[in-house]
């Protein structure tokens, strides 16, 4: 899948879940199941509830999202 096939949105982490997954509330109010991207996992970037994040959604499953960036 090419990079431009993803939908990028901003959201806020609502809750930590097991196995480095999170509940993320998007700007439009929807809540999705977010997981950390590989490079964020590799560099030990910590994500806590309340953090603003950028997520990528695939058009095939809009309930799961990849967390690709944590805003300062």
From Swiss-Prot:
One of its GO terms (cellular component) is cytosol. InterPro entries: NA-bd_OB-fold, RNA-binding_domain_S1_IF1, TIF_IF1. The keyword rRNA-binding applies. One of its GO terms (molecular function) is translation initiation factor activity. Residues 1-72 form the S1-like domain. Keywords: Cytoplasm, Initiation factor, Protein biosynthesis, RNA-binding, rRNA-binding. CDD domains: S1_IF1 (cd04451). It is found in: Cytoplasm. Gene3D superfamilies: Nucleic acid-binding proteins (2.40.50.140). One of the essential components for the initiation of protein synthesis. Stabilizes the binding of IF-2 and IF-3 on the 30S subunit to which N-formylmethionyl-tRNA(fMet) subsequently binds. Helps modulate mRNA selection, yielding the 30S pre-initiation complex (PIC). Upon addition of the 50S ribosomal subunit IF-1, IF-2 and IF-3 are released leaving the mature 70S translation initiation complex. NCBIfam families: infA. Component of the 30S ribosomal translation pre-initiation complex which assembles on the 30S ribosome in the order IF-2 and IF-3, IF-1 and N-formylmethionyl-tRNA(fMet); mRNA recruitment can occur at any time during PIC assembly. Belongs to the IF-1 family. This is Translation initiation factor IF-1 1. It comes from Dechloromonas aromatica (strain RCB).
């Amino acid at each position: 899948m090419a990079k431009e096939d993803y939908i990028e949105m901003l959201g806020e982490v609502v809750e930590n879940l097991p196995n480095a997954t999170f509940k993320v509330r998007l700007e439009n109010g929807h809540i999705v199941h977010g997981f950390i991207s590989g490079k964020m996992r590799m560099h030990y970037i910590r994500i806590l509830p309340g953090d603003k994040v950028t997520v990528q959604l695939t058009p095939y499953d809009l309930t799961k999202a990849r967390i690709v960036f944590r805003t300062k």
